Amino acid sequence: MITSREELDAIKKSCRAMVMKSSGLSAGAAVIPVPGVDIGSDVTLLMRLIPKINEKFGLTPEQIEGLDTESKVMVLTAISNVGSKMAGKYITRKLVLSLLQKMGVKVATKGVSKFVPFVGSAVAGGISFTAMRYMGNSHIDDCYRIALETLENREAAMATSTSSSSQTANEGFVPKDAEPPIKDL
């Protein structure tokens, strides 16, 4: 479980580097003028990338299931608040394909542009790089917001429990130099 904002920022930076690498691989596959190679490689890349990002942020289904009840509720509430489609879920081919279909215009443009000699492959590679980077970074941003909300809620819960327990400990405490209470006659 992430314990500080510094740790969270380091995870985000590490995940951004993974996304850049995957985006480069996606662009490389898109340059190959064979229909379907780019989509197949994008699906494979995303099916590896998204679970790695989830794991780094502590948001795989197994990691969430291993949390205590209170922490699990905090994480699931944060996922719901952010509206993430991939955090805390098993990443399937069907899920990845549906996300790629939502980017359908970019994918279709990439497919058509491939068949324009020389320039078309470069355009397809650029579109593929941009689409992969967008999807990866969007997921990182979602995971970051989920983890940050969970961290802030956990800190607030700890502060509340600490202040209420110190209040309870101080009840009935009267300093030596305090004046005795005035009694009604």
Which ranges hold each PLM region?
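Terminal, membrane-proximal amphipathic helices
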Residues: M1-A29, V43-L185
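Solvent-exposed beta-hairpin/edge-strand motifs
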Residues: I39
